[in-house]
Amino acid sequence: RSLKSHNAKRRATAVWERGCPRGCTFCSHNGMSRIDLQNIYGDGNRKDGEKLVRISDKENDTFQLPARWPSPQYAVDNIKLLKEKYDIDFVAIVDENMTSNLKWTKEFCGLYVKEGLNESVPWGTLGDAPSVATKPEIIKIMKDAGCDYISFGFESASNKVLNEDIQKGQLRSHLQKTLDTLKQEKMTPLTTFMIGNPHENIDDLMETVDFWIQ
C-alpha cells in the first residue's frame, strides 16, 4: 500500500517496446518470434530465419532477438498528452527491458524530470536482474525520475533451473544483487517466481523458498 500505484485514481498503461532481446523458454515473445522467423524469414527453416533477423553477439557466440523502441521524446510526449487530456496520476510502463536499455532509459528519465512529470505522474515498470547487477546506477536514475516500482521476473533461485529451464541469462547472484540495490535505494522489490519447471525437483524448490526467507 505504500506504492503510489495503489493509491492512483486515474491510472494509465503505456507500452512502447516491440519485440524482446531475450529468448526465455517460457515466454510468448520467444514462441511468437520463432514462429514468425520460421514462416516469414526462414523459408520453413527456423535456424536460417533466426540468422537473418537476429543480432549476432560475437563475444558470446550467441544471437539475440531484436527489440525496437520509439524515441524517448516520443514516450514523454505520450505521457504529457495523457496528463493534459485525462489528468492521469500514475502510468504503468509495461515495457520489459527498461533496466537493460540504458541509453534509452537515461534519456527518458532526463526528459521526464525536465518536464516536471516526475512530481505529477509517478510511474512503474518492468526490469531484468542481470542488467541491474552489472549497472546498478540505473535504479537511482529511475527513482529520481519518479519511478515508484520495478517488477522483476526472478522465476527461480536455483541456478540449475535458471540455466536449464528458464534460459534468461540470469543467476541467483544477479537476483541478490538486484535486491541489495533496491534496498539501498529504498525501493520496494516486486518479484515473480514460477514453480513446477521441467527439470525442477524438491531441492531446487527449497532453494527458492530459502531465498524468499532470506
Predicted regions: what they are:
Residues 214:
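Glycine-rich phosphate-binding active-site loops on the catalytic face of alpha/beta enzymes
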